[in-house]
Structure formats: C-alpha cells, structure tokens
Amino acid sequence: MITAIIVNYNSGALLTACVTSLLASPGPLKIVVSDNASTDDSIERLLAFHGDDERLMIVRNGANLGFSGGCNKGRPYVSGEYVLFINPDCVVRPDAIERMRTLMESHPEAGMAGCLIRNVDGSEQVGCRRYVPTPWRSLVRVLRLDRLFPGDLRFRTFNMAGTPLPSRPVQIEALSGAFMFVRRSALAQVGPLDEHYFLHCEDLDWCMRFRQAGYTILFVPDVAITHLKGGSQASPLFVEWHKHKGMARFYQQFFRHEYPWILMLLVILAVWARLFLMSPYLFLRREQGIHPDMR
C-alpha cells in the first residue's frame, strides 16, 4: 500500500487532474487530500468526479496551515510503507508510483526519492534535483560566480537543472517538495515536516534531516511527472515573503555553527535586503493579477 498526501488550497480543476492521474496507478493506493480551508470549488469538483472512490479521503483543516502543516495533518491517515507527498498541480503517469516503490525496495538505504519533474513544454523543472543551497552556494548564484569560473567545483551553484541527466538513479543532496516519495519507517525516525516553514524551504530542511539521520536521497531520472504550476492563487509578495523567511530559518538551523557569526549575519541581512528590493516589482505583479507558483 502507498499513501499519497496532497495539500490543497484553492487549486481549482488542477486538483482533480492530479487525483485522476494518481487513481490510474495499478497498485494498492490511498489518497489523502489535506485541504487548507479552500474557498474555491476545488473539493466540490473533486468529489463530483471521484467522491464514490473508497481510495480517496478528504481532511478538512479549519485554516490555511501552509504546506508543512497540511502534510502533517494527513500523516495520521497513512497506510502502507511508502508515502508520496505531491503537489496538486502535478500529473503522473500510471506506472510512476509503482516504479518508485520498486526502486525504493531495491535501495533500503534510501529514505526518500524524487523523480524527473518536467514543465509543460517538456523541459526539466529547476529545483527537482539540486545541491543544498549553503550560504556560499547562494552567494555564488547571486554573484554569478559559476559563470565566471565554469567547471570549477568551488563555484558551482545549487541548481542541477541543465546538467546532463544521469542514466540511472543517483544520490543527490536535495529534491523538490512537489514530489517526495518517502519511506514511512524513515519518516517515523526523522520526524514530520517543520511547520515553522509555512511555504518553501521545508523540503530542503527535510532533506538535510534525512541525510543527518543516515539515509540517502535518490533522484530517479527515468520516472517523469509534469508539474503544471499555478496550483494555488497567492500574491507574489506573500509567496516571496515566506520563501525568504524560510531561507533565513534554513541557514540559521543548519549553518550557524559552520560559518563565522558575522558572515551569517551578513547572509541573513542579504536575504531580507533582497526581498526589500524585490517588493516594488512583486507589488506590481500583484496589481496585474499575476500569481506565482506556490512550490
């Protein structure tokens, strides 16, 4: 048995498309939709299509708990040894989940695995495989040092998109929260997602904790899903606020003892300065009705 947990917040018709694709999987499956007090018709639409399917369960939360909180609300209803955390704007192929299960069975050292996440145009989505964004790597990205010193591993950025895809499953440092295939026993040891991250960076935090617990994280290049993006309507400033807040917490959680305190202070200040400089642009996007992807 595999349990899929989907956190929904005003995802519209995308939620139904995601669940429909999951229900096409051949193996035993349970789907838990954790709804963060949506105000649209996404749940009603889903129930109209699949309300009679016993594999589907709806958990109605009384407020918007964020991604981590929504995922954690679904955990008590998990059955089986594997849990798939997947965004509501993702569409999977019928064999994807079973292939991920088979892979995890053959790699007992792996606590979590991710797959190739594609954009609608078929290109690889940035963030589906990456190095941990340490303060140094983030500085490299901001200053574009990877372009000044191509090929120098000291100046590589954290995103791996654009590099050649491996021919087989490989270990990576971090994957995307849009699709996380997790071993339940590892989850019990590592613990739930950190709810201090409302949106973004909770996946990085979890990857760090899984690796600290001795588990590997696998990237599976021959299993692909499509991430449509736009699964939730939120203002650009709201999303970027939580993204920057999450990065500041992530740096403090894992790197405050590895870097001099003055450097960490500068890094945190740089995070908030970046958001401040972006704010006029983000406000303009909100006025134009442009909504970013929540993941």
Regions found by a protein language model. Give the residues of each.
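Glycine-rich, basic loop-to-helix element that forms the pyrophosphate-binding segment
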Residues: 60-78
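Short, acidic, metal-binding catalytic loop of nucleotide-sugar glycosyltransferases
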Residues: 20-29
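Short aromatic/hydrophobic "clamp" motif used to bind/position activated sugar donors
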Residues: 83
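Active-site-adjacent helix/loop segment of glycosyltransferases
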Residues: 205-286
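A conserved acidic beta->alpha catalytic loop
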Residues: 21, 35-44, 63
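Short, flexible, basic/aromatic active-site loop/helix in glycosyltransferases
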Residues: 132-172
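A short, conserved alpha-helix in the catalytic core of glycosyltransferases
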Residues: 164-224
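Conserved donor NDP-sugar-binding/catalytic core segment of glycosyltransferases
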Residues: 94-127
